[in-house]
Amino acid sequence: MVFFSAIATNTTKGDFFMRLKESAKEFGSLKSLVAMAMLLALRLALGFVTTIQVTENLKIGFTIFPTTVACMLFGPVAGAVMGGTADILGLMLKPTGPFFPGYTLDSMVAGFIYGYSFYKREKLTAVRVALTLATVTVLVNLCMTTSWICIQYGVKDFSLFFSDSAAAWQSFFAKFRAIFGGRAIKNACLYPVNTIGVYFLLNAVRRVPVLREYMKRGGTRA
């Protein structure tokens, strides 16, 4: 993705794996686990209270805010684990349909991207936040989630990806086009709101003395 490449321009291969290693170490801290649990609970609560189901295939929510805070504090590995856990627990506590692993993968990928982009950064600029959210919007929300909706309510399983049937793929793309427009409009409307909100929220959190000292532990990187 062009978007994510732009925010990772100055990142070396060693730095990438170092971030993964440091994020994984967060699970060894009791304070980190407690904070993760609190942010996970907040994400679930916001998901139950603020989510608006517009249509069967379209809903609006604000879980992005506790999600990005958690990812900034604990990194890509923790972000992916928390994303998957939140999706599964949310479905268990408030079922909205059958379990579908594609949506869990969406939450994990989004958490990984947020965590990698925001974790232990010396600065969180508006450009970094905007490009990160653009990456998640295009890759996860528009491409991946739309594909899962087509599979869940179309071919019913993942066999499509192993099929050479032209008719099956034509049916998939027809459904994809049918629901893509509405999802694109929704994401285009929410993108500036989410970007502005996440930028100011994360930078406000970074100014909290206790959290500022916590994030300095182990150092920051550009």
Predicted segment positions?
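Loop-helix junctions at membrane interfaces
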Residues: 2-222
